[in-house]
Amino acid sequence: MITPAEEQFSARHAYVPEHLPGYGRAFSGGEAFLVGDYLGYLREGTLIFVGYPLEETYNEKKMKALLAEAMRRFQPFRVALMAPSYSEPGGERKAVDYYYRLDLRSSRIPSKIKNMIHRAGRELRVEKSREFDAEHQKLIDDFLGSREVEEGTRVIFQKIADYLSSVPAAMVFDARDSQGRLAGFDVADFGSEEYAFYLFNFRSRKFPVPGTSDLLLQALIQEARNQRKFYVNLGLGTNEGVAFFKRKWGGMSFLQHEIILLSPRRPSFLNSIFRGMFSA
């Protein structure tokens, strides 16, 4: 559904991870497509529409017009829209969140974080690779078993191995102790021209080392600099603890993120879409 040239175009201009076709295919199980300046994924009657334009400035009215075009083309039973904003009433709406971004051209590591990195570095070493094995899966399973996690998030975590095996630009950063035990790992994607993407972070609950996540993120940032990226998309805030970690590194919220689940086969939904498209 998407040509090699379109896939390269999308990845080159990606500033949210869903813009990366390899990432989107791996975690949605769908086929990527482009409509205008927007990327989407289609799987078994479900359309996932990434409402962030690849090149243009976001315009909700234009986004809704292209969403309507995609719905006419594919006739989905369900639509999951992610966008900076969506003013139409109706649909099942998830909590509003924000993407955080670190500007590598101006960022400096705060002294408190340097201390944590130094502390963790006395016990751990960081290795980068594309390997994902039972040790990594065990940390994911431990995380899922230790707290309540939405089913969608659980499914995504279980697809990380498939994602890594299918996307050459994806990389794993491991933190290991002197005995070779895995204390934590990060997963990142470097497929965009300007952005690196900090996607997943897991730590060992069995032998936690203070500063593990800071040590790993430092290594990821250094790799992004080595690859001449301008930014690291640190991902969504998710909760206050996660958002605090990103802010302490200098991450700034730069994009609002909403998820709206829609039922396009309902006449009332289609009427509202078309009214919004042609209103002043």
Spans of model-derived segments:
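Conserved GNAT acetyl-CoA-binding A-motif
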Residues: 72-84, 225-235
